[in-house]
């Protein structure tokens, strides 16, 4: 599982499309009819400002107005109803941060967005550009109709939390909420009576049927579309003659990215223009194919925009069952890691910090899960390219190629790919005076170490090679000049 946050726009689109389409998890029949209104969600995205085109420039302001004009064309309803406007960039507690515009006309919403588009915004300790907004209809309601619901996955199953208080001042929901654990075996899904008695004991009885149906439908989508986390706050429940109308006003969600091969088409069709009622200028067929729609986007956390290289590795990672991760911490740093294994990557980063070079640690990342030769080669090239940019440093740079004891990843395969990448960048590695320190163990590790050592000799690279006789992070103090250099591994 790889739980990744998604935008509120995407979460609401998936939920709206599949709420009445996903097969019910419950063996009992629904008691109420779920009337799904037309989906009205407008995603407004602006480009990142640059040094050439800053947010205050006339050119950027013109881009903003062009985006607004496109929104009016695709979503004519924005001019016909009161609206809610808010950034959609994985920002928590937007209401508390003044990042929520309520009960606004389209002109008022535009002005509010206009003042913030492309501008730097500080939210707690994070600072980032506001470039993506969500606009949707405002739902008037009294405060006492706001509730809270959360579904999250744990080893034992899925927890459903429900609280009869919701909104920005909900407080400690973990302490307040009533909780129900849905077992991993969905054949043991709780009965309607259990759901009502466990979660809804503080809710008027006349609303139970509508809310139980909504909870079952919500959980069915959660399972069907491979969510790992889903929070709605507030969930507005407005009493009616037939029970209640339910509205999900604010939503935070995570999907299992590794389920894209299974659910990618479901995520895509829910966000296709036809599903969202978007008026397009081209020919409209009205038909929605199973594989029609845009691929899911997993944005970086607010204040942490992905670099081109990070996005490239993320793309590689999304296309494989292996794991390829890269985060640039300090592009000017002296110490770089090319490490196999999530656990080993933490150990190496920690060892660098313990040896007094935390401020020089350039990247954090890992490759694991038996990536192919081509995937490892592309990953290694990306790291080496980043490492050898800019002006060479007088003190040179250090590259640690390491890992623990591999289980099913073959060091022989991955090291052949890394050796090819070293050959591609041999001139730049020499120019930047890069010393290379290798430690690896696991199946066929001898062949892997032999290949990497021969590459060092072939390309005349300053490269030291160690096997399992060296502690997993034992080469770090040696590479940083904090410990004597020990004898290298020798082929038996």
Curated annotation (Swiss-Prot):
Residues annotated with Phosphoserine modification: 24
Subunit structure: Composed of two subunits.
PROSITE patterns noted in UniProt: SUCCINYL_COA_LIG_3
Organism: Schizosaccharomyces pombe (strain 972 / ATCC 24843)
Taxonomy of the source species: Eukaryota, Fungi, Dikarya, Ascomycota, Taphrinomycotina
Stretches assigned to coiled coil: none
Entry's EC annotation: 2.3.3.8
Residues spanning the signal sequence: none
Entry's family note: In the N-terminal section; belongs to the succinate/malate CoA ligase beta subunit family.
Name the UniProt record assigns to this protein: Probable ATP-citrate synthase subunit 2
Gene Ontology molecular function, alphabetical: ATP binding; ATP citrate synthase activity
Gene Ontology biological-process annotations: acetyl-CoA biosynthetic process; citrate metabolic process; fatty acid biosynthetic process
UniProt-listed InterPro entries: Citrate-bd, Citrate_synth_N, Succ-CoA_synthase_bsu_CS, Succinyl-CoA_synth-like
Main localization category: cytoplasm
């Amino acid at each position: 599982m790889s739980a990744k946050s998604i935008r509120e726009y995407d979460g609401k689109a998936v939920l709206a499309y599949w709420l009445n389409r996903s097969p019910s998890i419950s063996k009992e029949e629904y008691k109420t009819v779920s009337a799904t209104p037309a989906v009205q969600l407008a995603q407004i995205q602006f480009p990142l400002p640059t040094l050439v085109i800053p947010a205050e420039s006339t050119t950027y302001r013109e881009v903003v107005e062009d985006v607004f004009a496109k929104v009016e064309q695709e979503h004519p309803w924005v001019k016909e109803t009161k609206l809610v406007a808010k950034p959609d960039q994985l920002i928590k507690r937007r209401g508390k941060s003044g990042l929520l515009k309520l009960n606004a006309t389209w002109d008022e919403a535009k002005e509010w967005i206009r003042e913030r588009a492309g501008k730097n915004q500080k939210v707690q300790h994070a600072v980032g550009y506001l470039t993506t907004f969500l606009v949707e209809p405002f739902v008037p309601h009294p405060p006492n109709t706001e509730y809270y619901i959360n579904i999250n996955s744990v080893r034992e199953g899925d927890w459903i939390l429900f609280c009869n208080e919701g909104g920005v001042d909900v407080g400690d929901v973990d302490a307040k909420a009533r909780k129900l654990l849905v077992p991993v075996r969905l054949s043991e899904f709780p009965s309607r009576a259990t759901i009502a008695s466990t979660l809804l004991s503080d809710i008027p009885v006349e609303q139970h049927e509508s809310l139980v149906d909504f909870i079952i439908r919500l959980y069915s989508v959660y399972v069907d579309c491979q969510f790992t986390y889903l929070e709605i706050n507030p969930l507005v429940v407005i009493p009616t003659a037939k029970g209640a109308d339910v509205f999900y006003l604010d939503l935070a969600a995570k999907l299992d990215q590794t389920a894209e091969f299974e659910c990618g088409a479901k995520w895509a069709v829910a966000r296709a223009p036809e599903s969202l009622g978007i008026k397009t200028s081209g020919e409209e067929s009205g038909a929605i194919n199973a594989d029609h729609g845009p691929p899911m986007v997993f944005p970086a956390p607010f204040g942490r925009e992905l670099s081109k290289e990070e996005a490239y590795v993320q793309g590689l990672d999304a296309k494989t069952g292996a794991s390829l991760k890269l985060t640039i911490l300090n592009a000017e740093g002296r110490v770089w890691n090319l490490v196999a294994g999530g656990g080993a990557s933490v150990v190496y980063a920690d060892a660098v910090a313990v040896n007094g070079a935390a401020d020089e640690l350039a990247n954090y990342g890992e490759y694991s899960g038996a990536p192919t030769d081509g995937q490892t080669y592309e990953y290694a090239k990306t790291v080496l390219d980043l490492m050898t940019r800019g002006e060479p440093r007088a003190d040179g740079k250090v590259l640690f190629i390491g890992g623990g004891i591999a289980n099913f990843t073959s060091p022989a395969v991955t090291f052949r790919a890394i050796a090819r990448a070293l050959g591609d960048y041999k001139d730049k590695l020499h120019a930047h005076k890069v010393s290379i320190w290798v430690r690896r163990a696991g199946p066929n590790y001898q062949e892997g170490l032999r290949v990497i050592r021969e590459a060092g000799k072939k390309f005349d690279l300053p490269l030291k090679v160690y096997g399992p006789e060296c502690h997993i992070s034992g080469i770090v103090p040696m590479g940083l000049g904090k410990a004597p250099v020990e004898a290298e591994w020798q082929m038996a």
